[in-house]
Amino acid sequence: MIFALHGRPFKEDNIPYVQHLLYYLQKKEIQFLINESFVDYLVQCNILLPSFFTTFTNKTDLGKPDLMLSIGGDGTLLESATFIGDQNIPLVGINTGRLGFLATTPREELEGSVDELISGSYKLSERTLIKLISDEKLFGDLNFAMNEFALTKRDSSSMITVHTYIDGEFLNSYWADGLLVSTPTGSTGYSLSCGGPLVHPKTENFIITPISPHNLNVRPMIVPDSCHISFEIEGRNQNFLISLDSRAEIVSSNIKLSVKKEDFKIQLVELKNYNYYKTLRSKLNWGLDARN
């Protein structure tokens, strides 16, 4: 089997776990394909690398491994998805980060998790992506996001107005710091911190969430992911910031922007002990009470 590995810098206490992961994968005779920048970081951490491995820097170099392991937190997993794109490579997150809604495999359970991956004892959860359409070639071939599309003011000056349309029909003019369109997967991310609802990843919806709206009557809205959402932007500053997950670009107010569901999905690995509702309870501390 061939495993691709991608990661970001992690805290020092994760070094023994990452070293053990590499050792155990070698023991199981797994072939390695490691992101080139991650190799450089592992060398800096004095982590002993496999005796033989190849590297990749982009989707073309990646080829077709059996699995991709994302070593980090949710942000690392979102970045890993950009290497996979439409190739249907199963993606699993080894959590060396903090919260871990998506990177759900604990570092303490590496051997058992690797055994499940090798034996194929896991399920795949198809995750919808959101695609950006614009009259400029923004983000190149990576014009999709697993969590959310964000349209925000560029600096800390006055708010912006985002005129929003669904399938050509006017929805609302949001006077706010910005606007989010999130996938169900992204409902536990930026949207949640802006007051958006939790939406199960198997539902076929998008969540439109204003960021700090001036009108307190404006609330998040759930719409079908079959719709086409377009925007017109106004503001004192003629430049604005748009982002797809953690990738951002500056655009002018005269640009035409819209989003819709991407044609392909990301295959997220769910191991035997994974439970979506348990993850919500543990990560959001549901049921905790100082009186207990």
Swiss-Prot record:
Catalyzed chemical reaction(s): NAD(+) + ATP = ADP + NADP(+) + H(+)
Keywords recorded for this protein, A-Z: ATP-binding, Cytoplasm, Kinase, NAD, NADP, Nucleotide-binding, Transferase
Record carries keyword Nucleus: no
A Pfam family per the record: NAD_kinase_C
InterPro entries: ATP-NAD_kinase_N, ATP-NAD_kinase_PpnK-typ_C, NAD/diacylglycerol_kinase_sf, NADK
Residues given in the record as NAD(+) binding sites: D74, G75, N147, E148, D177, T188, G189, Y190, S191, L192, S193
Known EC number: 2.7.1.23
Places the protein is found: Cytoplasm
Family: Belongs to the NAD kinase family.
NCBIfam families for the chain: PRK01911.1 (NF002521)
Protein name: NAD kinase
